[in-house]
Amino acid sequence: MNKLFLLLTAFMATLQLNAANKYDNPDTLFVSRDGTAEFRNIDDAIEVCRAFMEYHKVIFVKKGVYKEKLVIPSWLNNIEICGEDRDQTLITYDDHANIKLAGNNKPMGTFRTYTVKIEGNDIIFKNITVENN
């Protein structure tokens, strides 16, 4: 009976450890707009990446149009964002310089109209189109 209890306890501890580290590995994360992958948005996949990773992480983005304003912060590095097809995998956003800022009603200006802002090091984009539409 004690052996069974010990075995069951060890098994449960292993499950909890694996659940806590689901995204903490060098594997590929998958993004798909149609819900057939772990994530529907690229930003959600970026959010689960660890700060100051020493390993390479790939975020594979399936074909589709992703209307997102992405920021890859300075504490993220070694990330490759790879599209399924460069002509059919699109990150887009529609800011422009004349949009009024909340609170002061001044124009946004061009420096705030990015679609993707990369502050981290060793960030690679492959086989994907980024546009500011």
Give the location of each predicted region:
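Bacterial Sec-dependent N-terminal signal peptides
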Residues: M1-D24
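Right-handed parallel beta-helix/beta-solenoid
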Residues: N18-D44
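Flexible, charged surface loops at secondary-structure boundaries
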Residues: K22-N25, A51-E54, S74, I118
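Glycine-rich, low-complexity intrinsically disordered segments
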Residues: T28, M53-H56, T129
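Right-handed parallel beta-helix/beta-spiral solenoid domain characteristic of secreted/periplasmic
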Residues: R33-G35, N77-N133
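N-terminal extracellular ligand-recognition/capping segment immediately after the signal peptide
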Residues: D34-I46, M53-E80, D85-D94
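Structural motif corresponding to the C-terminal cap of alpha-helices
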Residues: C49-M53, N132-N133
